[in-house]
Swiss-Prot record:
<dbReference type="InterPro" id="IPR037229">
    <property type="entry name" value="Ribosomal_bL35_sf"/>
</dbReference>
<dbReference type="InterPro" id="IPR021137">
    <property type="entry name" value="Ribosomal_bL35-like"/>
</dbReference>
<protein>
    <recommendedName>
        <fullName>Large ribosomal subunit protein bL35</fullName>
    </recommendedName>
</protein>
<feature type="region of interest" description="Disordered">
    <location>
        <begin position="1"/>
        <end position="34"/>
    </location>
</feature>
<dbReference type="InterPro" id="IPR001706">
    <property type="entry name" value="Ribosomal_bL35"/>
</dbReference>
<dbReference type="GO" id="GO:0003735">
    <property type="term" value="F:structural constituent of ribosome"/>
</dbReference>
<dbReference type="Pfam" id="PF01632">
    <property type="entry name" value="Ribosomal_L35p"/>
</dbReference>
<comment type="similarity">
    <text>Belongs to the bacterial ribosomal protein bL35 family.</text>
</comment>
<dbReference type="GO" id="GO:0006412">
    <property type="term" value="P:translation"/>
</dbReference>
<keyword id="KW-0687">Ribonucleoprotein</keyword>
<dbReference type="GO" id="GO:0022625">
    <property type="term" value="C:cytosolic large ribosomal subunit"/>
</dbReference>
<dbReference type="InterPro" id="IPR018265">
    <property type="entry name" value="Ribosomal_bL35_CS"/>
</dbReference>
<keyword id="KW-0689">Ribosomal protein</keyword>
<feature type="compositionally biased region" description="Basic residues">
    <location>
        <begin position="1"/>
        <end position="14"/>
    </location>
</feature>
Length: 66
C-alpha cells in the first residue's frame, strides 16, 4: 500500500502541539484592518487552538504529524 500524502495547504496553515492539538492563525487579519477595532486586532494576533471537531478534519489531511 502506498504512503498517504500530506496536503500541502494544510501543512502551511496548521501545526501540531506536543499533546496532539492543532494550532492555527485566526482568520480575518489579511486586509481591511483600518476599520477594525483595536480590541479585534489585538485578539487576532498570535495563534489559537482548533476545536475538537475542526482538529479531527485537519488531522486527516496531515497523517504523519500526530
Amino acid at each position: 500500500m502506498p504512503k498517504m500524502k500530506t496536503k500541502s495547504a494544510a501543512k502551511k496553515r496548521f501545526s501540531m502541539t506536543a499533546t496532539g492539538k492543532v494550532k492555527a492563525g485566526p482568520a480575518g487579519k489579511r486586509h481591511g484592518m483600518i476599520k477594525r477595532s483595536t480590541k479585534f486586532i489585538r485578539d487576532v494576533t498570535g495563534t489559537m487552538i482548533l476545536s475538537d471537531a475542526d482538529a479531527k478534519i485537519v488531522k486527516k489531511y496531515m497523517p504523519y504529524n500526530r
